[in-house]
Amino acid sequence: MEDLLVIGSKAKAAASELSHLVQTKKNEGLLACAKALIIHQKEILSANQLDIENAEKNQMKESLIDRLRLTTNRLEQMADGLRQIVSLKDPIGEVLSSEIRPNGLQILKRRVPIGVIGIIYESRPNVTSDAFGLCFKAGNAVVLRGGSDAIHSNLSIAKVLREALKETGINENAVQLLEDTSRETATKLMKLNEYIDVLIPRGGAGLIKSVVANSTIPVIETGTGNCHIYVDESADFKMALDIIDNAKTQRLGVCNACESLVIHENVLGEFLPQVYQRLTEKQVVFRADEKARAICPQMEEATEEDFATEYLDLLISVKVVKGIEEAIAHINHYNTGHSESIITSDYQNAMKFLEEIDAAAVYVNASTRFTDGEVFGLGAEIGISTQKLHARGPMGLEALTSTKYVVFGNGQIRP
Protein backbone atom coordinates (compact mmCIF):
# COMPACT_ATOMS: atom_id res chain seq x y z
CA MET A 1 0.00 0.00 0.00
CA GLU A 2 1.25 3.47 -0.86
CA ASP A 3 2.36 5.76 1.93
CA LEU A 4 -0.22 8.52 1.70
CA LEU A 5 1.69 10.66 4.19
CA VAL A 6 4.69 10.68 1.86
CA ILE A 7 2.47 11.51 -1.12
CA GLY A 8 0.80 14.28 0.85
CA SER A 9 4.13 15.69 2.00
CA LYS A 10 5.48 15.72 -1.55
CA ALA A 11 2.32 17.41 -2.80
CA LYS A 12 2.52 20.11 -0.15
CA ALA A 13 6.16 20.83 -1.00
CA ALA A 14 5.31 21.01 -4.70
CA ALA A 15 2.38 23.34 -3.99
CA SER A 16 4.72 25.70 -2.15
CA GLU A 17 6.94 25.90 -5.24
CA LEU A 18 4.01 26.28 -7.63
CA SER A 19 2.52 29.15 -5.64
CA HIS A 20 5.22 31.51 -6.91
CA LEU A 21 5.84 29.94 -10.33
CA VAL A 22 5.52 32.64 -12.99
CA GLN A 23 2.93 32.30 -15.75
CA THR A 24 5.50 31.79 -18.51
CA LYS A 25 7.01 28.83 -16.66
CA LYS A 26 3.59 27.29 -15.99
CA ASN A 27 2.70 27.64 -19.66
CA GLU A 28 6.03 26.09 -20.64
CA GLY A 29 5.22 23.10 -18.46
CA LEU A 30 1.72 22.73 -19.89
CA LEU A 31 2.99 22.86 -23.48
CA ALA A 32 5.64 20.27 -22.66
CA CYS A 33 2.96 18.00 -21.21
CA ALA A 34 0.74 18.45 -24.28
CA LYS A 35 3.64 17.56 -26.57
CA ALA A 36 4.55 14.54 -24.44
CA LEU A 37 1.03 13.09 -24.67
CA ILE A 38 1.41 12.95 -28.46
CA ILE A 39 5.02 11.72 -28.44
CA HIS A 40 4.14 8.90 -26.03
CA GLN A 41 0.74 8.05 -27.48
CA LYS A 42 1.80 4.52 -28.42
CA GLU A 43 2.54 3.52 -24.82
CA ILE A 44 -0.57 5.31 -23.52
CA LEU A 45 -2.80 3.54 -26.04
CA SER A 46 -1.19 0.19 -25.21
CA ALA A 47 -1.94 0.75 -21.53
CA ASN A 48 -5.48 1.78 -22.40
CA GLN A 49 -5.95 -1.42 -24.37
CA LEU A 50 -5.28 -3.42 -21.19
CA ASP A 51 -8.09 -1.51 -19.47
CA ILE A 52 -10.43 -2.09 -22.43
CA GLU A 53 -9.69 -5.83 -22.44
CA ASN A 54 -10.35 -6.06 -18.70
CA ALA A 55 -13.59 -4.12 -19.12
CA GLU A 56 -14.76 -6.49 -21.85
CA LYS A 57 -13.88 -9.51 -19.70
CA ASN A 58 -15.95 -8.00 -16.91
CA GLN A 59 -18.83 -7.47 -19.36
CA MET A 60 -18.93 -3.72 -18.83
CA LYS A 61 -21.65 -1.88 -20.77
CA GLU A 62 -20.51 -0.58 -24.14
CA SER A 63 -21.39 3.00 -23.20
CA LEU A 64 -19.02 2.76 -20.22
CA ILE A 65 -16.31 1.14 -22.31
CA ASP A 66 -16.59 4.05 -24.72
CA ARG A 67 -15.95 6.49 -21.85
CA LEU A 68 -12.88 4.45 -20.97
CA ARG A 69 -11.50 4.12 -24.51
CA LEU A 70 -8.65 6.31 -25.73
CA THR A 71 -7.82 6.85 -29.40
CA THR A 72 -5.27 8.91 -31.29
CA ASN A 73 -7.97 11.53 -31.79
CA ARG A 74 -8.92 11.58 -28.10
CA LEU A 75 -5.28 11.94 -27.08
CA GLU A 76 -5.00 14.89 -29.46
CA GLN A 77 -8.07 16.39 -27.79
CA MET A 78 -6.42 15.93 -24.39
CA ALA A 79 -3.29 17.67 -25.66
CA ASP A 80 -5.43 20.45 -27.14
CA GLY A 81 -7.11 20.81 -23.75
CA LEU A 82 -3.74 21.53 -22.14
CA ARG A 83 -2.87 24.01 -24.90
CA GLN A 84 -6.18 25.80 -24.34
CA ILE A 85 -5.37 26.14 -20.65
CA VAL A 86 -2.14 27.87 -21.68
CA SER A 87 -4.24 30.52 -23.44
CA LEU A 88 -6.32 31.20 -20.32
CA LYS A 89 -5.46 34.18 -18.16
CA ASP A 90 -3.48 33.20 -15.07
CA PRO A 91 -5.69 34.16 -12.11
CA ILE A 92 -2.89 34.09 -9.54
CA GLY A 93 -1.84 37.49 -8.26
CA GLU A 94 -4.96 39.25 -9.54
CA VAL A 95 -5.92 42.14 -7.27
CA LEU A 96 -9.63 41.83 -6.52
CA SER A 97 -9.88 44.98 -4.43
CA SER A 98 -7.63 47.75 -3.15
CA GLU A 99 -8.43 50.40 -0.56
CA ILE A 100 -6.55 52.96 1.50
CA ARG A 101 -8.09 53.17 4.96
CA PRO A 102 -8.40 56.39 7.00
CA ASN A 103 -5.40 55.30 9.09
CA GLY A 104 -3.24 55.12 5.95
CA LEU A 105 -3.15 51.32 5.64
CA GLN A 106 -3.38 50.09 2.06
CA ILE A 107 -5.35 46.83 1.99
CA LEU A 108 -5.35 44.65 -1.12
CA LYS A 109 -7.23 41.41 -1.72
CA ARG A 110 -5.26 39.10 -4.01
CA ARG A 111 -6.05 35.80 -5.64
CA VAL A 112 -3.78 32.93 -4.52
CA PRO A 113 -3.67 29.15 -5.09
CA ILE A 114 -5.68 26.85 -2.83
CA GLY A 115 -2.64 24.61 -2.29
CA VAL A 116 -3.14 20.85 -2.72
CA ILE A 117 -6.27 19.58 -4.44
CA GLY A 118 -7.36 15.95 -4.27
CA ILE A 119 -9.53 14.64 -7.09
CA ILE A 120 -11.36 11.32 -6.93
CA TYR A 121 -12.86 10.26 -10.23
CA GLU A 122 -14.14 7.27 -12.16
CA SER A 123 -13.57 5.79 -15.60
CA ARG A 124 -12.60 8.72 -17.83
CA PRO A 125 -8.79 8.72 -18.31
CA ASN A 126 -8.93 12.17 -19.93
CA VAL A 127 -9.69 13.58 -16.46
CA THR A 128 -6.10 12.74 -15.48
CA SER A 129 -4.65 15.35 -17.83
CA ASP A 130 -7.59 17.80 -17.70
CA ALA A 131 -7.63 18.00 -13.91
CA PHE A 132 -3.87 18.28 -13.71
CA GLY A 133 -3.80 21.12 -16.26
CA LEU A 134 -6.39 23.26 -14.51
CA CYS A 135 -4.98 22.72 -11.02
CA PHE A 136 -1.45 23.40 -12.25
CA LYS A 137 -2.33 26.65 -14.07
CA ALA A 138 -4.02 27.87 -10.88
CA GLY A 139 -0.81 27.15 -8.94
CA ASN A 140 -2.01 24.01 -7.16
CA ALA A 141 -0.50 20.57 -6.75
CA VAL A 142 -2.93 17.73 -7.38
CA VAL A 143 -3.30 14.22 -5.97
CA LEU A 144 -5.38 12.03 -8.28
CA ARG A 145 -7.26 8.87 -7.45
CA GLY A 146 -8.88 7.35 -10.53
CA GLY A 147 -11.06 4.29 -10.85
CA SER A 148 -9.71 0.75 -11.06
CA ASP A 149 -11.23 0.39 -14.54
CA ALA A 150 -8.77 2.95 -15.96
CA ILE A 151 -5.73 2.28 -13.79
CA HIS A 152 -3.31 1.31 -16.59
CA SER A 153 -4.32 4.32 -18.70
CA ASN A 154 -4.11 6.73 -15.78
CA LEU A 155 -0.71 5.48 -14.65
CA SER A 156 0.67 5.86 -18.16
CA ILE A 157 -0.72 9.38 -18.58
CA ALA A 158 0.51 10.49 -15.15
CA LYS A 159 3.99 9.08 -15.87
CA VAL A 160 4.17 11.06 -19.11
CA LEU A 161 3.01 14.27 -17.40
CA ARG A 162 5.50 13.90 -14.53
CA GLU A 163 8.42 13.26 -16.89
CA ALA A 164 7.50 16.29 -19.01
CA LEU A 165 7.38 18.53 -15.93
CA LYS A 166 10.72 17.22 -14.69
CA GLU A 167 12.36 17.87 -18.06
CA THR A 168 11.04 21.44 -17.90
CA GLY A 169 12.59 21.99 -14.47
CA ILE A 170 9.29 21.89 -12.59
CA ASN A 171 8.64 19.72 -9.54
CA GLU A 172 7.12 16.51 -10.91
CA ASN A 173 5.11 16.08 -7.71
CA ALA A 174 2.80 18.81 -8.96
CA VAL A 175 0.83 15.75 -10.12
CA GLN A 176 0.69 12.42 -8.30
CA LEU A 177 -1.60 9.49 -9.04
CA LEU A 178 -2.46 6.82 -6.48
CA GLU A 179 -1.65 3.36 -7.81
CA ASP A 180 -3.83 1.71 -5.18
CA THR A 181 -7.49 2.08 -6.22
CA SER A 182 -8.93 0.27 -3.20
CA ARG A 183 -11.73 1.82 -1.17
CA GLU A 184 -9.55 1.61 1.91
CA THR A 185 -6.92 3.87 0.36
CA ALA A 186 -9.57 6.23 -0.99
CA THR A 187 -11.06 6.55 2.49
CA LYS A 188 -7.63 7.28 3.96
CA LEU A 189 -7.08 9.92 1.29
CA MET A 190 -10.33 11.59 2.35
CA LYS A 191 -8.89 12.11 5.83
CA LEU A 192 -5.53 13.59 4.82
CA ASN A 193 -6.39 17.03 6.21
CA GLU A 194 -2.80 17.86 7.08
CA TYR A 195 -1.81 17.87 3.42
CA ILE A 196 -4.87 18.19 1.18
CA ASP A 197 -6.83 21.45 1.23
CA VAL A 198 -9.91 20.40 -0.73
CA LEU A 199 -11.36 17.28 -2.37
CA ILE A 200 -13.31 17.31 -5.63
CA PRO A 201 -15.20 14.12 -6.58
CA ARG A 202 -16.00 13.68 -10.27
CA GLY A 203 -18.41 10.90 -11.13
CA GLY A 204 -21.81 9.46 -10.37
CA ALA A 205 -24.10 10.08 -7.43
CA GLY A 206 -22.72 7.09 -5.50
CA LEU A 207 -19.14 8.33 -5.65
CA ILE A 208 -20.09 11.88 -4.67
CA LYS A 209 -22.22 10.71 -1.73
CA SER A 210 -19.40 8.47 -0.51
CA VAL A 211 -16.85 11.29 -0.58
CA VAL A 212 -19.20 13.75 1.15
CA ALA A 213 -20.05 11.17 3.84
CA ASN A 214 -16.49 10.02 4.55
CA SER A 215 -14.23 13.01 3.94
CA THR A 216 -12.90 15.13 6.78
CA ILE A 217 -11.37 17.41 4.13
CA PRO A 218 -13.62 20.16 2.70
CA VAL A 219 -15.41 18.86 -0.41
CA ILE A 220 -16.63 20.68 -3.50
CA GLU A 221 -19.50 18.59 -4.87
CA THR A 222 -19.59 18.37 -8.65
CA GLY A 223 -23.11 17.39 -9.04
CA THR A 224 -25.58 15.06 -10.35
CA GLY A 225 -28.15 16.86 -12.46
CA ASN A 226 -31.83 16.09 -12.03
CA CYS A 227 -32.63 18.97 -14.38
CA HIS A 228 -36.19 20.15 -15.16
CA ILE A 229 -37.85 22.10 -17.94
CA TYR A 230 -41.12 23.83 -17.02
CA VAL A 231 -43.50 24.49 -19.92
CA ASP A 232 -45.59 27.48 -18.83
CA GLU A 233 -49.08 28.14 -20.22
CA SER A 234 -47.72 30.97 -22.40
CA ALA A 235 -44.92 28.86 -23.89
CA ASP A 236 -44.21 28.88 -27.61
CA PHE A 237 -44.76 25.21 -28.47
CA LYS A 238 -42.20 24.99 -31.28
CA MET A 239 -39.56 26.58 -29.07
CA ALA A 240 -40.47 24.25 -26.21
CA LEU A 241 -40.27 21.15 -28.41
CA ASP A 242 -36.88 22.12 -29.84
CA ILE A 243 -35.45 22.93 -26.41
CA ILE A 244 -36.76 19.76 -24.75
CA ASP A 245 -35.53 17.59 -27.62
CA ASN A 246 -32.07 19.13 -27.38
CA ALA A 247 -31.90 18.99 -23.58
CA LYS A 248 -33.02 15.36 -23.40
CA THR A 249 -31.58 13.63 -26.46
CA GLN A 250 -28.49 15.49 -27.69
CA ARG A 251 -26.27 13.71 -25.16
CA LEU A 252 -27.78 11.38 -22.59
CA GLY A 253 -24.96 10.75 -20.14
CA VAL A 254 -24.25 14.32 -19.05
CA CYS A 255 -25.27 16.13 -15.88
CA ASN A 256 -26.93 19.04 -17.71
CA ALA A 257 -29.38 16.86 -19.67
CA CYS A 258 -33.09 17.30 -18.95
CA GLU A 259 -34.53 14.48 -16.84
CA SER A 260 -38.01 15.81 -16.03
CA LEU A 261 -40.78 17.82 -17.70
CA VAL A 262 -43.13 20.00 -15.68
CA ILE A 263 -46.17 21.11 -17.70
CA HIS A 264 -48.91 23.66 -16.98
CA GLU A 265 -52.31 21.93 -16.97
CA ASN A 266 -53.83 24.53 -19.34
CA VAL A 267 -51.56 23.42 -22.21
CA LEU A 268 -51.42 19.73 -21.32
CA GLY A 269 -54.00 18.49 -23.84
CA GLU A 270 -52.39 20.26 -26.78
CA PHE A 271 -48.70 20.11 -25.89
CA LEU A 272 -48.20 16.70 -24.29
CA PRO A 273 -49.09 14.62 -27.39
CA GLN A 274 -46.66 16.72 -29.43
CA VAL A 275 -43.71 16.28 -27.09
CA TYR A 276 -44.57 12.59 -26.67
CA GLN A 277 -44.46 12.05 -30.44
CA ARG A 278 -41.26 14.07 -30.84
CA LEU A 279 -39.29 12.21 -28.18
CA THR A 280 -40.67 8.69 -28.71
CA GLU A 281 -39.37 8.94 -32.27
CA LYS A 282 -35.97 8.95 -30.56
CA GLN A 283 -36.86 6.01 -28.28
CA VAL A 284 -37.41 8.13 -25.15
CA VAL A 285 -39.65 6.42 -22.57
CA PHE A 286 -42.05 8.62 -20.56
CA ARG A 287 -42.91 8.06 -16.90
CA ALA A 288 -45.77 10.35 -16.00
CA ASP A 289 -48.24 11.30 -13.28
CA GLU A 290 -51.96 10.50 -13.40
CA LYS A 291 -53.02 13.71 -15.18
CA ALA A 292 -50.49 13.23 -17.97
CA ARG A 293 -51.39 9.56 -18.40
CA ALA A 294 -55.04 10.55 -18.81
CA ILE A 295 -53.96 12.36 -21.99
CA CYS A 296 -51.32 9.84 -23.10
CA PRO A 297 -52.17 6.45 -21.53
CA GLN A 298 -49.21 4.84 -23.33
CA MET A 299 -46.90 6.49 -20.81
CA GLU A 300 -45.59 4.47 -17.88
CA GLU A 301 -46.70 5.39 -14.38
CA ALA A 302 -44.21 7.60 -12.53
CA THR A 303 -43.21 6.84 -8.95
CA GLU A 304 -41.78 9.16 -6.31
CA GLU A 305 -38.37 7.73 -7.16
CA ASP A 306 -38.74 8.72 -10.82
CA PHE A 307 -39.14 12.38 -9.94
CA ALA A 308 -35.93 12.22 -7.89
CA THR A 309 -33.85 10.31 -10.45
CA GLU A 310 -31.06 11.48 -12.75
CA TYR A 311 -31.68 8.92 -15.49
CA LEU A 312 -28.75 9.58 -17.86
CA ASP A 313 -30.77 7.43 -20.24
CA LEU A 314 -33.67 7.46 -22.71
CA LEU A 315 -36.15 8.16 -19.90
CA ILE A 316 -38.00 11.29 -18.81
CA SER A 317 -40.54 11.97 -16.06
CA VAL A 318 -43.61 14.21 -16.43
CA LYS A 319 -45.37 16.25 -13.75
CA VAL A 320 -48.52 18.33 -14.39
CA VAL A 321 -48.99 21.50 -12.31
CA LYS A 322 -51.69 24.13 -11.86
CA GLY A 323 -49.31 27.07 -12.24
CA ILE A 324 -45.92 28.67 -11.64
CA GLU A 325 -46.12 28.36 -7.83
CA GLU A 326 -46.64 24.61 -7.93
CA ALA A 327 -43.98 24.22 -10.63
CA ILE A 328 -41.38 26.03 -8.52
CA ALA A 329 -42.31 24.03 -5.40
CA HIS A 330 -42.04 20.73 -7.29
CA ILE A 331 -38.70 21.60 -8.90
CA ASN A 332 -37.14 22.89 -5.68
CA HIS A 333 -38.24 19.71 -3.89
CA TYR A 334 -36.71 17.28 -6.38
CA ASN A 335 -33.86 19.13 -8.06
CA THR A 336 -30.18 18.64 -7.31
CA GLY A 337 -29.27 22.31 -7.58
CA HIS A 338 -27.82 22.01 -11.09
CA SER A 339 -29.75 23.56 -14.02
CA GLU A 340 -33.44 24.41 -14.42
CA SER A 341 -35.33 26.05 -17.30
CA ILE A 342 -38.69 27.73 -17.94
CA ILE A 343 -40.28 28.08 -21.37
CA THR A 344 -42.59 31.08 -21.24
CA SER A 345 -43.70 34.33 -22.90
CA ASP A 346 -44.74 35.79 -19.55
CA TYR A 347 -42.09 38.19 -18.22
CA GLN A 348 -43.37 38.11 -14.64
CA ASN A 349 -43.37 34.31 -14.55
CA ALA A 350 -39.87 34.26 -16.01
CA MET A 351 -38.58 36.64 -13.33
CA LYS A 352 -40.36 34.70 -10.58
CA PHE A 353 -38.76 31.48 -11.80
CA LEU A 354 -35.29 33.08 -11.88
CA GLU A 355 -35.67 34.48 -8.38
CA GLU A 356 -37.21 31.48 -6.63
CA ILE A 357 -35.61 28.41 -8.23
CA ASP A 358 -32.65 27.22 -6.15
CA ALA A 359 -30.05 26.05 -8.67
CA ALA A 360 -26.57 26.88 -9.94
CA ALA A 361 -27.92 27.87 -13.37
CA VAL A 362 -31.46 29.01 -14.19
CA TYR A 363 -32.65 29.51 -17.77
CA VAL A 364 -35.46 31.32 -19.55
CA ASN A 365 -36.29 29.90 -23.00
CA ALA A 366 -33.04 27.95 -23.43
CA SER A 367 -31.73 24.41 -23.07
CA THR A 368 -30.14 23.25 -19.83
CA ARG A 369 -27.34 21.77 -21.96
CA PHE A 370 -25.54 25.12 -21.94
CA THR A 371 -24.31 24.76 -18.35
CA ASP A 372 -20.67 24.27 -19.21
CA GLY A 373 -17.44 26.11 -18.43
CA GLU A 374 -16.47 26.71 -22.04
CA VAL A 375 -19.96 27.90 -23.01
CA PHE A 376 -20.01 30.27 -20.03
CA GLY A 377 -16.70 31.80 -21.13
CA LEU A 378 -14.64 30.23 -18.35
CA GLY A 379 -12.52 28.07 -20.64
CA ALA A 380 -11.98 24.53 -19.40
CA GLU A 381 -13.75 23.40 -16.23
CA ILE A 382 -12.90 21.06 -13.36
CA GLY A 383 -16.59 20.23 -12.90
CA ILE A 384 -19.96 21.81 -12.17
CA SER A 385 -20.53 22.55 -8.50
CA THR A 386 -24.05 22.10 -7.13
CA GLN A 387 -23.22 23.45 -3.69
CA LYS A 388 -23.03 27.06 -2.54
CA LEU A 389 -19.58 27.10 -0.92
CA HIS A 390 -16.84 27.58 -2.10
CA ALA A 391 -17.89 27.61 -5.75
CA ARG A 392 -21.20 27.19 -7.58
CA GLY A 393 -21.86 26.24 -11.19
CA PRO A 394 -19.12 25.55 -13.78
CA MET A 395 -15.73 25.77 -12.08
CA GLY A 396 -12.94 27.31 -14.12
CA LEU A 397 -9.51 28.46 -12.96
CA GLU A 398 -10.85 31.08 -10.54
CA ALA A 399 -12.77 28.41 -8.63
CA LEU A 400 -9.44 26.68 -7.96
CA THR A 401 -8.08 29.69 -6.11
CA SER A 402 -8.47 31.35 -2.73
CA THR A 403 -7.71 34.89 -1.58
CA LYS A 404 -5.16 36.59 0.62
CA TYR A 405 -5.25 40.06 2.17
CA VAL A 406 -2.03 42.04 1.69
CA VAL A 407 -1.61 45.08 3.94
CA PHE A 408 0.95 47.88 3.44
CA GLY A 409 1.66 50.30 6.26
CA ASN A 410 4.23 52.90 7.32
CA GLY A 411 4.47 52.20 11.01
CA GLN A 412 0.79 52.07 12.04
CA ILE A 413 -0.05 50.50 15.40
CA ARG A 414 -3.53 49.68 16.63
CA PRO A 415 -4.76 52.16 19.26
UniProtKB/Swiss-Prot annotation:
Its EC number is 1.2.1.41. Keywords: Amino-acid biosynthesis, Cytoplasm, NADP, Oxidoreductase, Proline biosynthesis. It is found in: Cytoplasm. Pathway: Amino-acid biosynthesis; L-proline biosynthesis; L-glutamate 5-semialdehyde from L-glutamate: step 2/2. Pfam families: Aldedh. It catalyses: L-glutamate 5-semialdehyde + phosphate + NADP(+) = L-glutamyl 5-phosphate + NADPH + H(+). GO terms for biological process: L-proline biosynthetic process. GO terms for molecular function: glutamate-5-semialdehyde dehydrogenase activity; NADP binding. It is an enzyme of class 1 (oxidoreductase). GO terms for cellular component: cytoplasm. Belongs to the gamma-glutamyl phosphate reductase family. PANTHER family: DELTA-1-PYRROLINE-5-CARBOXYLATE SYNTHASE (PTHR11063:SF8), GLUTAMATE SEMIALDEHYDE DEHYDROGENASE (PTHR11063). Catalyzes the NADPH-dependent reduction of L-glutamate 5-phosphate into L-glutamate 5-semialdehyde and phosphate. The product spontaneously undergoes cyclization to form 1-pyrroline-5-carboxylate. NCBIfam families: PRK00197.1 (NF001221), proA (TIGR00407). This is Gamma-glutamyl phosphate reductase. The gene is proA.
